[in-house]
């Protein structure tokens, strides 16, 4: 498995997608009652605390990533995004889709397809 380190000498070493997925899952966990693993200001919101925890490298990132995938499967057939909660067919389809996405992400992540050095926002190009 890949080493889930996000910052090496101040540079992001994972994809932005992975960082957003992990931070959003950890923020969700904090909002659901999990206790923070790092010192933080009283005024810090859960997304800020989540990013501080990810930066501290004290998390089990694989477990956090798979918790995010499970949450997507859980909510995919429960009335969100226009899907009827009465539809029994929605959940197996969503579960298969997420398993396919999860498999593809693992393959891409392990093959180093995700590379932040090749990605830039239009706003960033004018700053250089």
UniProtKB/Swiss-Prot annotation:
InterPro entries: DNA-dir_RNA_pol_omega (IPR003716), Pol_omega/Rpo6/RPB6 (IPR006110), RPB6/omega-like_sf (IPR036161). This is DNA-directed RNA polymerase subunit omega. Promotes RNA polymerase assembly. Latches the N- and C-terminal regions of the beta' subunit thereby facilitating its interaction with the beta and alpha subunits. Transmembrane segments: none annotated. It catalyses: RNA(n) + a ribonucleoside 5'-triphosphate = RNA(n+1) + diphosphate. GO terms for biological process: DNA-templated transcription. One of its GO terms (cellular component) is DNA-directed RNA polymerase complex. The gene is rpoZ. Keywords: DNA-directed RNA polymerase, Nucleotidyltransferase, Transcription, Transferase. It is an enzyme of class 2 (transferase). Its EC number is 2.7.7.6. The RNAP catalytic core consists of 2 alpha, 1 beta, 1 beta' and 1 omega subunit. When a sigma factor is associated with the core the holoenzyme is formed, which can initiate transcription. It comes from the Bacteria. It comes from Neorickettsia sennetsu (strain ATCC VR-367 / Miyayama). Belongs to the RNA polymerase subunit omega family. SUPFAM superfamilies: RPB6/omega subunit-like (SSF63562).
């Amino acid at each position: 498995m890949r080493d889930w380190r996000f910052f090496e000498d101040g540079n992001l070493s994972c994809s932005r997608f992975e960082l957003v997925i992990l931070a959003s899952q950890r923020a969700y966990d904090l909002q659901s009652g999990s206790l923070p693993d790092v010192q933080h200001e009283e005024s810090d919101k859960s997304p800020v605390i989540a990013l501080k925890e990810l930066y501290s490298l004290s998390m089990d990132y694989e477990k956090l990533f798979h918790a995010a995938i499970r949450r997507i499967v859980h909510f995919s057939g429960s009335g969100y995004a226009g899907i009827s909660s009465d539809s029994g067919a929605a959940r197996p389809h969503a579960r298969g889709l997420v398993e396919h996405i999860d498999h593809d992400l693992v393959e891409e992540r392990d093959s180093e397809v995700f590379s932040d050095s090749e990605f830039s926002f239009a706003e960033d190009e004018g700053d250089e």
